[in-house]
């Protein structure tokens, strides 16, 4: 094995990340073109993807993207909501051009449109959902790289990276790993230092999808905690160590407590005893 192949070999840490996010679990359906990437079929239906072949295709896709001189000529598209955050981070870290949400028909073919683009490479999350972008790319001769599941068609796809492209965390991890490999090939980071940009370590969960309702609840809870802390800090401080007046003779001080300490129950008992004597 050459030193370059050993340097880019799949590490145990990356394997654990793929397994933890279930990136190796495909769908129950199987396309005949994807059969070469399937390791075996699980007893309850899902097809298990060979993570070694996933890694090989991921490296091939990273080399193709890194070969483009201008990073802005790489257009990334995904209509899947789970991949929107990953697309934003991928474009910010690699310099690619991102198209969020719905892909407008004619974006690659109609020059009159304001959103018209002439990319050199197109990267998508799912060939089924992003079929419009794949079709237009074939019209203008733009190569297409896609994350593909076991049921995904490989027609018009130049490089398919087999993985679970439907999971919230798995698709985020795949975009994170692709961005990391691209930056390694460009020489901006190294495998020894890890995915570190501007002194900050980029973790995979930064690419994960976050539910807006859950994020709003977390922000509301944080504001409530801050308000409670400020209210507690505004309360006056009580000095429990302050000393009271000094008492010289406790016997003299407590002599007057006898009559003052009578309760209503004592008075009632005395009255009842007087009535019985009467």
Swiss-Prot record:
InterPro entries: Ribosomal_uS2, Ribosomal_uS2_CS, Ribosomal_uS2_euk, Ribosomal_uS2_euk/arc, Ribosomal_uS2_flav_dom_sf
Biological-process GO terms, alphabetical: cytoplasmic translation; ribosomal small subunit assembly
Primary residence: cytoplasm
Coiled coil spans: none
Origin: domain of life: Eukaryota
Gene3D superfamilies recorded: Glucose-6-phosphate isomerase like protein, domain 1
Modified residues (N-acetylserine): 2
Summary of the function given for this chain in its UniProt record: Required for the assembly and/or stability of the 40S ribosomal subunit. Required for the processing of the 20S rRNA-precursor to mature 18S rRNA in a late step of the maturation of 40S ribosomal subunits.
This protein's name: Small ribosomal subunit protein uS2
Organism placement in taxonomy: Eukaryota, Metazoa, Ecdysozoa, Nematoda, Chromadorea
